[in-house]
Every structure is written in structure tokens, then in C-alpha cells.
Amino acid sequence: MRRTLCLTVSLTVLALSQAAHAQTASPDAAPDIADARIATSVAPLVVTANRTALAPDKVGQSVTVLTLPQIQADQETVVADILDRTPGVIVTRSGGVGEPTLLNIRGAASDQTMVLVDGVKFDDPSAADGGYDFSDLLVSDVSRIEVLRGPQSTLYGSQAIGGVVNIVTADATRPLQGDAQVEGGSYGTFYAKGGIGGLDGPLSWRLAANDYTTTGISAFDERLGGHEADGYSNQGVSGRLGYEFSPDVSVDLRGLFVSARSDFDGFSTPSGNFGDDSEYGTTREAIAYAGLNFGLLDDRLKNRLALQYTTTDRDNYDPTDAPVTKTFDGVGTNARAEYQGLLAIAPGWQGVFGAEHEQSTIAVSTPAFNDPASPAFFPPGSPPVSAHVSTDSGYGQLQAEVIKGLNLTGGLRYDDTSSYGGHVTGQASAAWSLNGGDTVLRASWGQGFKAPSLYELYSEFGSTNLRPEQATGWDAGIEQHFWDRRIDLQATYFSRDTNNLIVFVDCFDPANPRCAFGGFFANVDRARAQGVELSGAIRPLRGLEITANYTRTDATDRSPGATSGNSLPRIPKDTANAAVSYIWPIKLTTALAVRYAGKSFDDIANTMPLKAYTLVDLRAVYPLTSHLEVYGRIENLADAHYETTFQYGNLGRAAYAGLRVTF
């Protein structure tokens, strides 16, 4: 039924596109696909860094912006695989597509990254650490991604220690427009998506849907005996509706829903053995947003009032029992009301300020482990967790061009949380544009924090005495353009210290009540991450582009004890990416991409090594018409065997081909 829905959307778009092409092209016709790719070097505006659109040379923070042509050129179906190619980002996955997928920025833990979808905070309060799992986030209707590196809690609050990832979906720009894509390939993979929308006077709208299925590979490494393929399916729908009552007043409604199912390997029940496992899980994620935008003071003061709601519902099952046993049941929600104001104080001077109220809830249980009749029962059982926490916040930031080309930014934030009280964070940055923008000097300093998760606070392992994890970081760099901007170079040094890290402490003392369940969460660890990010691009000929980036990350444990000085888990010291693409005179585009990740360790004791690896991809795109193209790619051309999580495999050589249409 779900695949039928998505194919119906896709076929409808295809039919409409053919009807549109039969008419004479109008001035606002859809852009030529190939020509759009040639324009990828144009610097887009940056929104996430200051919560308002600014030219890149006015932004002091380190940020990467990925536009729609760049996203389409990568041909990836999973957002995490696109992000894995950006400076400072490491992605780890416990198996193939759909398995747990975690993202680290500059050596920060995955739960220390803020994830936004169309500006809406998207985490999972039901997860043990409260972080976001990227496994179910497909490219689907994504049209833009911004990756903001460094502590950013002043504007974004808890979790923004490593940085912020803002994912933006497509919006309508013409009276009627749409797109569709169908793809198939290795491991029984099928992917289809479609979207349609319009902008007609004051009304704008868009609807989109996707369907993805794959038989997958064994999540447990096949070289260690994994043989059972762990499949995955994902169906999603999204939509947005906007209406302008006047030039100063508008409303904005958005929604997203994802339903996914994944097989997984790990510790089986009831034996507890690690390896091939027949368990599977289902996930349902949803986002709802309603906003009112209005201007005051001759539109010098732009205001936004919004209500946001997100929910994640996860269930795991063991089919080996009769009847099927539910081993995990977790629901996490976030409800937020917020106000944001943007005041144009004077030419080159503006302030952004706001207030937020957020309430997060958790309801988690492990039914199979608590049922004495279940073969998975493990006395004394695991008590269910049901709790909530509320946070009230206020922030303000001033951005000013104090002299021509020199932009300074500074801000403060205060959070009052029901679980631990108040917390203050601040940040400052500078961007100095010289030589007509060909040289940009940047520097930023910021603080970040991560509040204890609801599970860390209220589970049988938790403590309401936990304090927030805290971080202070800075970076400085230069951006240089040469040869009429056909050569772009960037270099950045970064450093961050994090304290009060929350970890699980093993404890087996029967006289200590905190040891009743074998351990507890506590603020005991410290860490430091520092390094260098280098990136560059050269376009020596029309249609030819060469890009590369390299990141050196020294992320180490700074806690007293045996592991002091050890590398943090799953953070390679060296990562690099390079790509060469060329648009031939016949408009065929070919590309070769290489990714390298150095060796790392899966544990803080540094006893479980993860070997270095190199991946090579080939891609090709050919436009049949200005609105219809075929494409294909070979991933992991050399069929390299590698692990990003200890004893979990990854996809070998794989080939995919597809068709994309726009109108």
C-alpha cells in the first residue's frame, strides 16, 4: 500500500511533466538540470550560524552549506552518507542501511550534535543518551543542508556541543512544479520518491513521499560468521503550507512522518550471545510545526511565533518466541513553544533574540525482560521509565559590521531546567572580508552544554543529581579565493574541552544501593578534541571540478585513570575526501570520489581496533532532455572490507541506476 502511494505520486509527477513539456516554455520554466550543476560554485547564504540569512563572508563560525545540485550529484539516498563527506564529520553505522547510524562532529559524541529539520529540533528523548539516530533519515525531499561546527548552545541550547546539522526540505517557487525519482540496484534495493507543489500569489504548498526497501546484508560481520541478511524498509511523507495575508503577516505549517522497519543483529535474547540475531525493530517519527510570522516597525522588527512537536516511537521484537515477544517499547516526545525576533538596528547592525519553552517526555519499558513467563525474563527485571522535564530559555545576540568588511557577533543564553536548574552559555565570533571578498579571516569562541537525558536521570541506572555536560571551544581560519574564484581554499584550526561527561559506571557492591542493577550514570569524564580542517576546490576548465578535504582530529580522554590520554571511541585521527567530476560536451557528467578514514578504536580502553579503509565510488549522469535524466553509480568499487563499529559489517561493492525528472 505504501509503495503504491509513492509510485502513484511519482507517476503523477511524470505525467504532469510530460504535459508541461508539450507547451511552449515560459520565462519561469524549470531550470536545465545540467546547467544547474555548473552553478554549484556560487556561494549560498548561511542561515544556521546566526538564525538569519547572511552572506558567507559575514559569518565567523565554521560552516559547510550543501545545495540541491551538490546533494543530487552525490546520488546518495541516506543523509548520513552525504554528511560523511564533509569536513570534521564522522559517521558510524552498525551494519548496512537502516542500522543504527551515529554522527560525530569534531570528535564530539553523537548525542552532542543538534539536529534540526526545517529548523525544528529533532532528537529522541526515549534514547538512553537522548541523541538522534540518523538511520531513518533519507534524502527524500531534502534540498539543502548546513553543517555548523563548534559549540553553538547560545542560539540552540542543549546538545549543540559538537555543532548543528540543519536539514531543509524543498519549497515551491513557481505556480506548479514537481519532481520524481526511481532507483534500483544491489542488495535488492528499490527507492522511489516524488514531490509536487506550487506558489500562486499568497499561497504556497508542497507534498512529497518516498519508499525505500532493501534486503541488505548481515549487520554482524560476515567474516565473523554473519550470514542472515538484515533487511530494511522506510516510507515517508512530508508537506508544507504557507499563506501570506499581507506583505508583513504570514502563516507556515509543516509536517513530516516516517515509518521504518529494520532487522538487526546484536545480543540475542535470552542467551545474550553476540552475533546473528532474528530480532527486528519498527520506528515511527513525526514532526509538526505551526508558525506565525509578522513584521513591526515598518518591517524592521521581524517576529516569529511557533509551536513545534516531535515524537519518536520505537519497538523491538524477538520473533523466535511464540507468540512474538516485544523486547523494547519506547516513546519520546518534544513539545516546544517559541518566539524569535530579528531587529534591524541600523545598516549593518542587527539583533536576534528569543524565548522558548520546551517539555520532553519519555516512556520506556522492556516487556520481555519483565515477564516471568517470557524466555527473555531476567530477574529482577527492568522497571519501566516514565518521566518528563521542562526547560525555559531566553537568548540574545548582536551582529554588527563595525567597519567595512569586519563583522562581529556576540550573544548570551540562559536555560532554566526543572531537573538541574539554571545554565548560562555565551559565544562570540568575527569575520573579516578583505580583497573584495577573496580573503576572509574567521574566528569564533563558544560554549556548549548537553542536559542529562531523561533515561540518565530517571531510569534504574539514573540519578537526579546529574549535571549538564559542558564544553568550551574555539576555532580560527582563513578562506582564500584565486583565479577569479576558480580556486577556493579553506583552513581552520579548532580546539574544544568538555567536562562533566556522563558515563555508565560499573558497580557490583551489594552494600551499595546504587549497584543494585550493576552500575549507574555519573558525571566523571573529561575530554579534549583539537585539530585542523582543510578543504579546497579548483575549476580549471568549464565543466571540470576537483574538490578535496582533510581533517586531523586528536580526540582524547582527559579523565584521571587508566584510560587518560587514550583516543575517544570511533574517532579516526585522519579522514580525507576527494572527488573529480567533469561535464562532457555531450552533457554527460562523470565523477570519481574517494574517501579515506584512518584507524580508530571502538572502546575507550583502546583494545578493540577498527582498521583504516579507503572507499572509491564512480558516478555518471546523462540528461535525456532538459528535465529528464538517467544516472548510475558504483559504490565501494574495490569491494573493500571495513568496519566503523566493531564486529559490524558494511556494504561491499554495489551498483545502482535510476531516473530523475523535474518540471
Residue map of PLM features:
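N-terminal Sec signal peptide and the immediately downstream disordered periplasmic leader
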Residues: 1-76, 80-86, 243, 288, ...
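Conserved C-terminal beta-signal and adjacent last beta-strands/turns
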Residues: 2, 6-8, 197-200, 208, ...
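Extracytoplasmic beta-strand/coil segments of soluble accessory domains associated
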Residues: 48, 80, 84-121, 143
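N-terminal periplasmic accessory domains that precede
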Residues: 79-82, 100-104, 113-116, 132-137, ...
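Short acidic/polar hinge/loop motifs at secondary-structure boundaries
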Residues: 121-149
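Periplasmic-side early beta-strands and strand-to-turn transitions of outer-membrane beta-barrels
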Residues: 153-154, 166, 173-175, 183, ...
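Membrane-embedded beta-barrel scaffold of Gram-negative outer-membrane proteins
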Residues: 203, 210, 300-318, 359-363, ...
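Gram-negative outer-membrane beta-barrel transporters
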Residues: 401-408, 495-497, 522-603, 638
